[in-house]
């Protein structure tokens, strides 16, 4: 599977089999899965009170594996076939009663690949250049160029919006 570098995002629904997807979703939506609060979504200086989210780091290039749940991602790695990981993290955006669109950002300033995997269906979305808006749909993978500006939004029809972002070569 190839992530686009200069193309429009690629969407693949039903990315994982139910046998691989269900345990991953159960883990991230479980009562004991650790989520960590961040007061800004896009950049550190974005301190609007409604622009917060929760994250969980699975892997970071300078630290390596950072989560006991990392092994649950192997079915995704088997399909993405990364040569090297930069970062893998889960994002959880709380329903705030209205849709909040976060500021545009790039994940890293250098050329690499990106994949965004949705854990639940909701009316939250990810926005890309050329007014491309892709809804969060359970078990949907979006392959995109994360060094180009993009932004997220919250949802209003579910308690949370949860996805996993993969940055890799």
Give the role of each language-model region.
Residues 98-104, 110-112, 118-137:
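A short beta-strand-loop-beta hairpin characteristic of the jelly-roll/cupin
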Residues 95, 134-151:
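Conserved metal-binding segment of the jelly-roll/cupin
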Residues 115-117, 158-169:
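A short hydrophobic beta-strand segment most commonly corresponding to one strand
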Residues 81-91:
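A short coil-to-beta-strand element that immediately follows conserved catalytic motifs
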Residues 103-105, 149-157:
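Short beta-strand His + acidic residue motifs that chelate non-heme Fe in jelly-roll/DSBH
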Residues 92-94, 119, 168:
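Short beta-strand segments enriched in hydrophobic/aromatic residues
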Residues 1-83, 96:
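Non-heme Fe(II)/2-oxoglutarate
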């Amino acid at each position: 599977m190839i992530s686009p570098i200069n193309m429009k995002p690629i969407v693949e629904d039903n990315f994982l089999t139910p046998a691989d997807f269900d345990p991953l979703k159960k883990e991230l939506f479980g009562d004991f899965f650790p989520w960590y609060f961040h007061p800004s979504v896009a950049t550190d200086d974005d301190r609007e009170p409604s622009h917060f989210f929760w994250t969980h780091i699975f892997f970071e290039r300078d630290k390596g594996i950072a989560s006991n749940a990392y092994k649950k991602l192997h079915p995704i790695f088997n399909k993405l076939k990364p040569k090297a990981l930069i970062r893998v993290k889960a994002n959880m955006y709380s329903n705030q009663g209205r849709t909040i669109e976060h500021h545009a950002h790039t994940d890293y300033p250098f050329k690499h690949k990106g994949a965004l995997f949705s854990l639940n269906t909701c009316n939250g979305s990810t926005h890309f250049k050329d007014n491309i808006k892709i809804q969060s749909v359970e078990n949907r993978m979006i392959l995109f160029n994360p060094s180009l500006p993009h932004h997220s939004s919250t949802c209003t029809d579910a308690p949370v919006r949860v996805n996993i972002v993969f940055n890799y070569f």
